[in-house]
Amino acid sequence: MSRVALVTGGSRGIGAAICVALKAAGYKVAANYAGNDERAKAFEQESGIPVYKWDVSSYQACVDGIARVEADLGPVDILVNNAGITRDAMFHKMTPEQWGEVIGTNLTGVFNMTHPLWSGMRDRGFGRIVNISSINGQKGQMGQVNYSAAKAGDLGLTKALAQEGAAKGITVNAICPGYIGTEMVRAVPEKVLNERIIPQIPVGRLGEPEEVARCVVFLASDDAGFITGSTISANGGQYFA
């Protein structure tokens, strides 16, 4: 029986690429999403990957959503915590709501998804957790104090949880993408991309979602069983941590 992978924020962008790559690698894949129903259903039809809607900032919604996935596909062996939002503002203008929403999805959401799955992974003696953090969680970013704090928190969670899971056959790793050519990034004016963003990237281009996805496929595999508590920086040389 093939292993089951669950990807949060899996119906678009980097998450969609991760889902497609995991399916191509032979996994049974489920994609969580929270927003656009039409977009999610289109992804489901195009990819053949089932989609499930819930908000990862709610612990009970995660418990219920995971139960639906496991009833359909079987126990989840691989969890990719990819869901993330931004509520950018300079700190002196940031509201408690902007802070709380980003922390709730980008950091607490990782706990909410991982915690209900942890006991089952321990009992089965196998698990793969891959947390999609960000270059801005490594270096910080002006105007993104909330996002940078949440993504840095994901890295601390990764390192601590890796120590707890290692003896039970569970690995916990993180990937920190830089500028990736998602729909959101490519919507930035071409002048800004070419004059301000790409010159910061030593390889001279944006990354592709599929490049991040290939990192996930490796970390999910048996070949990566000796790698845990690690961070892969997929940023084209923009930042070395």
From Swiss-Prot:
Positions with a binding annotation for NADP(+): 12-14, 39, 82-86, 177-180
Cellular-component GO terms for this entry: cytoplasm
EC number: 1.1.1.36
UniProt-annotated catalytic positions: 147
Molecular function via GO: acetoacetyl-CoA reductase activity
CDD domains per record: BKR_SDR_c (cd05333)
BP GO annotations: lipid metabolic process; monocarboxylic acid metabolic process; poly-hydroxybutyrate biosynthetic process
A Pfam family hit: adh_short_C2
InterPro entries, per the entry: Acetoacetyl-CoA_reductase, NAD(P)-bd_dom_sf, Sc_DH/Rdtase_CS, SDR, SDR_fam
Domain of life: Bacteria
Compartments where located: Cytoplasm
Keyword terms: Cytoplasm, NADP, Oxidoreductase, PHB biosynthesis
UniProt keyword Oxidoreductase, yes or no: yes
Binding-site residues, substrate: 88, 141-144, 178-179
Pathway annotation from the record: Biopolymer metabolism; poly-(R)-3-hydroxybutanoate biosynthesis
Catalytic activity, reaction form: a (3R)-3-hydroxyacyl-CoA + NADP(+) = a 3-oxoacyl-CoA + NADPH + H(+)
Database matches in PANTHER family: 3-OXOACYL-(ACYL-CARRIER-PROTEIN) REDUCTASE, 3-OXOACYL-[ACYL-CARRIER-PROTEIN] REDUCTASE FABG
Family that this chain belongs to: Belongs to the short-chain dehydrogenases/reductases (SDR) family.
Name of the protein in question: Acetoacetyl-CoA reductase
Organism: Rhizobium meliloti (strain 1021) (Ensifer meliloti)
